[in-house]
Amino acid sequence: MKRLILFAMLVCTLPALACTNLIVSKGASADGSTFITYAADSHTRYGQLRYCPAADHPEGATLKLYNYGSLKFQIEIPQPAHTYQVVGFINEHQLAIGETTWGGISPLDKGNAEGIDYGNLIYVTLQRARNCREAIKVMHELVSTYGYADGGESFSLADPNEVWIFEITSKGSEKGAVWVARRVPDGYICGHANQARITTFPQMGKESYKSIDSRNLKYIDRPEVECVYASDVVKFAKQRGWYSGKDADFSFADTYNPLTFSGLRACEARVYAMFNRAADGMKRYEAYAMGDKNAERLPLWVKPNRKLGVQDVMALMRDHYEGTPMDMTQDVGAGPFHCPYRWRPMDFEVDGKKYVHERAISTQQTGFSFVAQCRGWLPSKLGGVIWFGVDDTYSTVYCPIYCGTTQIPVCFEEGNGSMSRYSETAAFWLFNRVANFCYLRYDVMIKDVQKVQKELEDAFVKEEVAHAERWAQEDNDRRLIGELNRFSNDRAERMMRRWRELDQMLLMKYIDGNIKHEKDGKIETTETGVVRFPQQPPYPAWFYRQIVDDKGEVLRVTE
């Protein structure tokens, strides 16, 4: 039996930057695409789309890296002879990367004193790798050479053929990192949400290349390779006194990010929510998701009960635990209008007992999110699409931006506004205006939002498929790039125009707690132009009961 030695270790709870990723293999998708999703949830993260053009670099050229969070100078590293174009989190070869942070155990959670942080590890890798396997090799080389200045992370990797989950943590005061990467089996989906998920994993055998360690990366392109890991991932834990069992029984997650109540309820529960809506038989993991460490553990991947299209994947990123005991629309915290959002802090105490609000996939503090779609049957510039949205996933619109795009739409452009500077032309601020207004009377207003959301996304998906088919045979690179720019920018402009109309309609329709009558997208008036008297639906009966229980003697009507 393996034995985990956990004394004198502090386990981090929910990280400040809490995100959600879904990973969909080629065989699990409806059209042979691969998908990864990423919701960048942070109270300080602004929604914008980074662009870095491809470039040739002279000998001796260097790259200065600034910390992804603090923007402080981190490290300067040599440039290779050539780097690839990157649009957000996907490059010109349809390699896409997402992440979620889990921190891990002390003293590894702070990372090396110097080195590359997780954000720059993503961006530098996208500039240097063409597929998932190259990405694993590049990431290992970067952290081994320059150090890893962050704690525990889970990365999602996708290219047109494969999807992988890659988990890593620093070695603390010792330079470098320990990590494990596993290929998601074809036909399956995987996910992670701020909790390490790879437990035991296949290790190197004498007559098999199914699993290789970092000393054997020369074999990484062999098709049978399905697991890759740092050669000292077990040895390092043993040297630190954190594990003393057999190498074959070693669990990466249990050693470097042991389960806690918050790791289950605030993190694993989000993966459960995705699996629960996509696969059969997930009820058995409900107790685990709700915080029972002794319950049956959620598997690393599951086989979905249907093939997933791009809109199915978008839908899986829109969830408040509806239909489960954790449904955020149903408890008293949702208020009379069933608002599934809770302001921070998440935890609270009453009469000496501790409680927690749920942490759902859809949350108010999302800076941006995306669905990255990779399609091997199309030219790379056209095949890779980052369906990009800002703010809350439940009320965002995913706009198609091609990986071959060279002109980012103004509404997503870097520098167009910030968390401390409002911009009328920034999608982030417009979508926040709409979402935050909806939180006032959520159950009614969100339906108006979803109607326009569906209108736009249905059109965008249909138009994108037709557009890709029409331009798949284009051999003039310059003409193709111009068309990609036009298509993506036109959709972004249409989205902004339609969302401004929605913003104005919501204000007119719902101002002051009223609900004005609407017909054919316009506020109804009488023949003389006077607005019809609005609807004023009462609060639900249970809410009136709470008012009476709390203040009934003061509010009671007397004769």
What are these regions (language model features)?
Residues 19-118, 138-307:
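A contiguous strand-loop segment
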Residues 453-559:
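Histidine-centered catalytic/metal-binding microenvironments
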Residues 1-4:
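Positively charged n-region of N-terminal signal peptides that target proteins for export
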Residues 257-353, 359-361, 447-450, 455-468, ...:
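Accessory, solvent-exposed terminal regions and/or long lumenal/extracellular loops of proteins
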Residues 13-17:
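N-terminal signal peptide c-region/cleavage motif recognized by signal peptidases
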Residues 122-128:
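Short, well-ordered beta-strand elements within core beta-sheets of diverse protein domains
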Residues 330-472:
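Substrate-recognition/cap regions that form aromatic- and gly/pro-loop-enriched pockets
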